[in-house]
Amino acid sequence: MDEDAVPPLGLLLAAHAGGAQASRHRALWAFDARLAKIARTTSEPMIGQMRLAWWNDVIEDSTGIKGQGEPVVDAMRATGACGAPGLVGVIDGWEILLVEPDIDMKGLRDYASGRGGGLVRALADAADAPDWLAAAGQVWALWDLAGHVGDKALGQAALALAVEIL
C-alpha cells in the first residue's frame, strides 16, 4: 500500500503505535481515506452507496477473495484489520454524508458516531471502547469534516457539535 494513501495525521499516529500495530493503523487510516474519496468524488448518492456497499462486502468477506489486489484491502487483510470492530460504522458514517444533502444535527451526530467512533474502535481493536474514546473519535471526525467541507455553515455546525461533545 502506498503511504500516499494515508493522511498525514494517520501516518503520525501510526508511527506512534509502533511495531506491528503501525502497519495495521496505516491500513485503517487508508481505509477511512478511501471512503472519504468516495464521498468527495461521488455526484450521485446511489452510485456512492454502491461503492460503499462494495467496501462493506469486502470487510465481511470471510473467504478473503472479494477485493483481492486492491492495495488498501490487501493491507487490511495482511494486518488483520478487516475483522476490526467499528468498520461498518465508518462506512455508515460516510454514507450519511452521501445521502443527506441538507444534513441536520442528528445526521451530523450519526456521521460522527459512525465514522469517528467506528474508526477509534477499529484502531483500538475494541468493540466496547470507553465512552471517552468514542467521544474523542467523534470530535476528530467533526473537526476533519469542518476542515474539508466546502459548505461554511456545515463546517461551523460540525465544530459547534464537536465543542458540545467535549
Regions of interest found by a model, annotated:
Residues 1-166:
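Acidic catalytic motifs of isoprenoid enzymes
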